[in-house]
Amino acid sequence: MNARGKDLETADLLKNFVFSKSKDVDDTQKKWNSIVDNLDKIDTTNYIRHYWNSSHKFIRKNDLYREIVKFIKTPADVSAFLDSLENCSQFYHDIAFPEENVDFTDDKLISCLKNLKILKAKTFYPILLAMKQAKESYSEKDLLTVAETIEVYVFRNFTICGKVANTGERFFSEIALRIYGDLNSVTAICKEIR
């Protein structure tokens, strides 16, 4: 609980945890501040959850803290975790707020991300985060191809068919995890989404 008696958010618990495991508190503070600054108005817990679900087995918000602390054992683990979170944080902001994007130059990609935002789609974020982190180097054109496939999927399943949007959460997370393995091309990723 915080000073006002409210339960701490998962992001606050994780922040406390990584600081307790860190050997270099100043560096940890610098990285954490950079993550929060990059995210701007985005909820840090939601970002961390999408980030986690992009490279690990699907986890719900209530179990996120318990799951992450299983993986962070040493100061080196803390540093690697924060480096990766920091590396993806601006990218995440740009997919969530394409109209404020910093890094994307492809107008079609920006437009597609805006369309997904209009559709209130967020459950696909782990797929694009996985593409950012994968050993394959995906271009903006690759991201566009996948984002367009996601846009069709979201429109068809959630807008036309009326499925509940969060039903896609596990589906997209499972695809994201496979991007590090057998789904190692844009064609394979799009085929799986279709």
Model-derived features: positions:
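A cross-family structural signal marking well-folded subdomains
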Residues: 11-194
